[in-house]
């Protein structure tokens, strides 16, 4: 077994705190509209320049194993906050550092770490309640754009494009971020349900200029098996022909004989038809076919539903106002499904998302929700260089998450002011003993930290800024972008409540663990053996 180094009490805590400080000091320079850039070396290619706190945190590994423990602990704060709220990673890191530094002074003075932790937990609970009271909901295009702009480091263009995307696909719609091909940001919205399967044969194309098949007021057949015999299809083809409507066939596959008949019918103009393969594989394919069925009002022809293809009728078919089939994808627009059934299906998938254990499953389920709930928006990020593109995409991603969080739980005044105002909740709180009271004071002091860092990064004196902000009330605060004081909500300087809440919760949780640490165990450095030692110089 590998030998271990063990450190106890102050020796253990001091090394961890050093690591906490190294990581936090590197991350906090990015905080606020006047935050600085961090340049990160890559193993190959150009270095990355970023103002994204979690990107900086993820790159840091320290040589000293004990110090590295501290850095990795705080890295967890940033990562967890990013996972839950999508933003606020730098704020969480700054808060964690402040609580650790204040707490260590009290531990060094001989106070009980467990009582300090109880005091911290009590104070954080009160502050979270106060943040909920300060929070207000957002809904307008302007408010959503403001939140997006703040999270993208005061880039109004990013805020506007995110607000436009949300307006078009709804707050539950999928918004994806891709590399653009021009210098400008672009928004591309796919309305209706899109899946990544195109026509089985190019002979179904009825618009050669666009290389696509367009079916208006179409009937839709859904089948979970291969269609090999044309005899099985005849009843449906005849029914569609009599109804005078085009037909879209979605099946596992359409084999040669059946495909040839469909192509001939289509080319002769007897029946406007197109066939595509069903999306997904295995159980996911069954689920997606069921989604399509609910969206279009169809019944999936399968053994599980007790339906046979050769006995299918018009009642088993779904319909949509328009279907667009291209080489690689199919879009079904304005399906005839029942709105209540679609809503129930969305709720059912959301339950599965909450229970999903893998990120991949969760992502696929979220895609299904978005397709049912309303379209997909693609933000194409434009930039001059690859380095700028990477940095800009990180900011768009942050802003997107923050905007979703704001729509979910509302907004509070930004720039660290909400945390400063929430300190009012601590004025009447007392712990069970003096050590718990000290824990409450630790949080009271730490809540100033984000505003201090924002002011320092903007080149102002933090103590003067805090004093001035405390003279005002409510939304009155310091706008670091302009260097002026005023109503931050009116100025568009806002933070999502969920981001601020998550940052404080995670910071306090991790900081409390550091304060209550009494021993650390790390792998001992390997001693160089005599064989691997460098040869002595012989002097000639």
Curated annotation (Swiss-Prot):
HAMAP family the UniProt entry points to: CH60
Compartment(s) where it occurs, according to its Swiss-Prot or TrEMBL record: Cytoplasm
The protein's Enzyme Commission number: 5.6.1.7
Principal subcellular localisation of the protein: cytoplasm
Family recorded in the similarity comment: Belongs to the chaperonin (HSP60) family.
Protein name according to UniProt: Chaperonin GroEL 3
Catalysed transformations (reactions): ATP + H2O + a folded polypeptide = ADP + phosphate + an unfolded polypeptide
InterPro entries noted in UniProt: Chaperonin_Cpn60_CS, Cpn60/GroEL, Cpn60/GroEL/TCP-1, GroEL-like_apical_dom_sf, GROEL-like_equatorial_sf, TCP-1-like_intermed_sf
Pfam families: Cpn60_TCP1
GO molecular function term, any single one: ATP-dependent protein folding chaperone
Keywords from the UniProt entry: ATP-binding, Chaperone, Cytoplasm, Isomerase, Nucleotide-binding
Family matches, as SUPFAM superfamilies: GroEL apical domain-like, GroEL equatorial domain-like, GroEL-intermediate domain like
Subunit structure, as described in the record: Forms a cylinder of 14 subunits composed of two heptameric rings stacked back-to-back. Interacts with the co-chaperonin GroES.
Record's function text: Together with its co-chaperonin GroES, plays an essential role in assisting protein folding. The GroEL-GroES system forms a nano-cage that allows encapsulation of the non-native substrate proteins and provides a physical environment optimized to promote and accelerate protein folding.
């Amino acid at each position: 077994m590998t030998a271990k180094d063990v450190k106890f009490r102050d020796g253990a805590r001091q090394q961890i705190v050093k690591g906490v400080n190294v990581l936090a000091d590197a991350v906090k320079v990015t905080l606020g509209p006047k935050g600085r850039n961090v340049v990160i070396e890559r193993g190959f290619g150009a270095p990355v320049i970023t103002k994204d706190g979690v990107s900086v945190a993820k790159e840091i590994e320290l040589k000293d194993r004990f110090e590295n423990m501290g850095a990795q602990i705080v890295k967890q704060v940033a990562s967890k906050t990013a996972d839950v709220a999508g933003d606020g990673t730098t704020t969480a890191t700054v808060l964690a550092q402040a609580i650790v530094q204040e707490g260590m002074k009290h531990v060094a003075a001989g106070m009980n770490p467990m009582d300090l932790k109880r005091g911290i937990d009590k104070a954080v609970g009160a502050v979270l309640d106060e943040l909920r009271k300060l929070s207000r909901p957002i809904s307008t295009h302007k408010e959503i754009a403001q939140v997006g702009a703040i999270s993208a480091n005061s880039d109004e263009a990013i805020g506007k494009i995110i607000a436009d995307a949300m307006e078009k696909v709804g707050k539950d719609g999928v918004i994806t971020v891709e590399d653009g091909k021009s210098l400008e940001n672009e928004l591309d919205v796919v309305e209706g349900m899109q899946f990544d399967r195109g026509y089985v044969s190019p002979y179904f194309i009825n618009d050669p200029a666009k290389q696509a098949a367009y079916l208006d007021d179409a009937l839709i057949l859904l089948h979970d098996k291969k269609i090999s015999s044309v005899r099985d299809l005849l009843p449906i083809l005849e029914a569609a022909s009599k109804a005078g409507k085009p037909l879209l066939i979605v099946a596992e596959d359409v084999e040669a004989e059946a495909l040839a008949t469909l192509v001939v019918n289509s080319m002769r103009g007897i029946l406007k038809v197109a066939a595509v393969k069903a999306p997904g594989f295995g159980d996911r394919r069954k689920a997606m076919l069921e989604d399509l069925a609910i969206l279009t009002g169809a019944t999936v022809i399968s053994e599980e539903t007790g339906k046979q293809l050769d006995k299918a009728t018009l009642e088993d078919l779904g319909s949509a106002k328009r279907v667009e089939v291209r080489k690689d994808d199919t879009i079904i627009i304005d399906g005839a499904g029942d709105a209540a059934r679609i809503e129930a299906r969305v709720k059912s998938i959301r339950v599965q998302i909450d229970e999903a254990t893998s990120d991949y499953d969760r992502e696929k389920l979220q895609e299904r929700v978005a397709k049912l709930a309303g379209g997909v928006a693609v933000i194409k990020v434009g930039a001059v260089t690859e380095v700028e593109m990477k940095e800009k995409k990180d900011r768009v991603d942050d802003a997107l998450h923050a905007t979703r969080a704001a729509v979910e739980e509302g907004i509070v005044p930004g720039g660290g002011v909400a945390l400063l105002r929430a300190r009012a909740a601590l004025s009447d709180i007392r712990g069970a003993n003096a050590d718990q009271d000290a824990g409450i004071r630790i949080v009271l002091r730490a809540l100033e930290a984000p505003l201090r860092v924002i002011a320092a990064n903007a080149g102002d004196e933090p103590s003067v800024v805090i004093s001035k902000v405390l003279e005002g009330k409510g939304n009155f605060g310091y706008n670091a972008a302009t260097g002026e004081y005023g109503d931050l909500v009116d100025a568009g300087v806002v933070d999502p409540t969920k981001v601020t809440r998550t940052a404080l919760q995670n910071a306090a949780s991790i900081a409390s663990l550091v304060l209550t640490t009494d021993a650390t165990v790390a792998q001992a450095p390997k001693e160089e053996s005599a064989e691997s030692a460098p040869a002595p110089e012989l002097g000639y």
